[in-house]
Amino acid sequence: MPGELGSRTGQMTDLIYAEKDLVQSLKEYIRAEENKLSQIKSWAEKMDVLTSKSTSDPEGYLAHPVNAYKLVKRLNTDWLELENLVLQDTTNGFIANLTIQRQFFPTEEDETGAAKALMRLQDTYKLDAETLSRGNLPGTKYRSTLTVGDCFGMGRTAYNDGDYYHTVLWMEQALKQHDEGEDAAVSKVEILDYLSYAVFQFGDLHRAMELTRRLISLDSTHERAGSNLRYFEKLLEKEREEEGKEKSVNNTGTTTEAVVQSGAYERPLDYLPERDIYEALCRGEGVKMTPRRQKRLFCRYHDGNKNPHLLIAPFKEEDEWDSPHIVRYYDVMSDEEIEKIKELAKPRLARATVRDPKTGVLTVASYRVSKSSWLEEDDDPVVAKVNQRMQQITGLTVKTAELLQVANYGMGGQYEPHFDFSRKDEPDAFKRLGTGNRVATFLNYMSDVEAGGATVFPDFGAAIWPKKGTAVFWYNLYRSGEGDYRTRHAACPVLVGCKWDLDKVSEATHRLEEEVAEPGTHPTFWRR
């Protein structure tokens, strides 16, 4: 689906090698055409250095979100410009290879999606444009920077989406780097054109005029800028007429110049009421882990209520939260099992969907950005083995559970606050599964994440960080069958790295007392 490439690390890795192949093809073309333009040769050398670094450790390279964005941008925009240049002096070999590879290239929508992912990281983790542009991110192996053109591309993406907040941030960064002397194909005039209009959209008329005047000083023939400036001047004159005077009068009768706050623009509110709480938890802020609560959390060995399979080798169990009770189990999956699960899942990965509460139809949504696939026990013995292990740990039957769901969160991958259970206003949400509502969630972490990617619960202020080989477990319903609305949770955007998890949601078609009525299967911590 367009716009989702950045959410899948495996597919992005393929692009690394595709780009490397193109570089080799380009070098062969240069050798065949010794009189080739020096501009193309320079491009090839630059790409050769870049792809040599990226192919030496593709996953590590793509762990840096700036690298991932620039890869998509290069393949969608920069290589197209090069193709046009080469076509001026056509050589069949290189063009044929490029044409073949282009069918696998990112699209305009993919580049837009990658840019929006960077903006999502920028907002969630309170990173200014300067930090992202300079590549100063925690846990990164490769330092990668954004050029003036890259920053301009980010700003233009935001502008085309009607997002003037990010337009201002990124056009300002592009202008700053341009003013510092960085070489750029994009001109200051182009940057100022976008920036002045975006600033005007925030109602900052004085700064819009200032930026427009600067644009005109660089290009006095710019018709739109001249027209805009005249329009701004008329608006300002109208404002002054309505006020009756240029200066505001205070209560003492003295006059003061009206204060204009330039450049301080607030991020617009959106559809998510708990946005601030959710994003703060993603940053590790506002976690309500008090000393009193900490004293109620313990570690123990868990044998599944004396399950014969676990008596000899019980699992290490750690309380993550007291109410609702959330626990973490250690060494649930081995590295070999994790790699096998990922191997089975990768060919089937597709954009994760959500159920539209109004229509009941599965659809993609901007608040869930990841790739997922579903595994059955018949797919491989390891699936049945992992399934059985989760049943032994939780005491919940696998027969009334969804298939194993593997999720891959790449650059900016996230799942905003949501419930795992069906609410009363959507009683048929799980009808297609032939089971019932989702009793509990067993979430296996199949990777460590260098930065970001926490599982957070905005209602009670908990944040749980991924640890490879561990799993967290909680109940979504009370024993009465009523949903526990406190369990609304989210998968925070991945800032640096790649996140893999394996999700198992147990379901019930009847009252939960019957679901766990079999002796020895009732989890000890389930509370009404």
Predicted regions and their residues:
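Fe(II)/2-oxoglutarate oxygenase catalytic core
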Residues: M1-F473, L477-R528
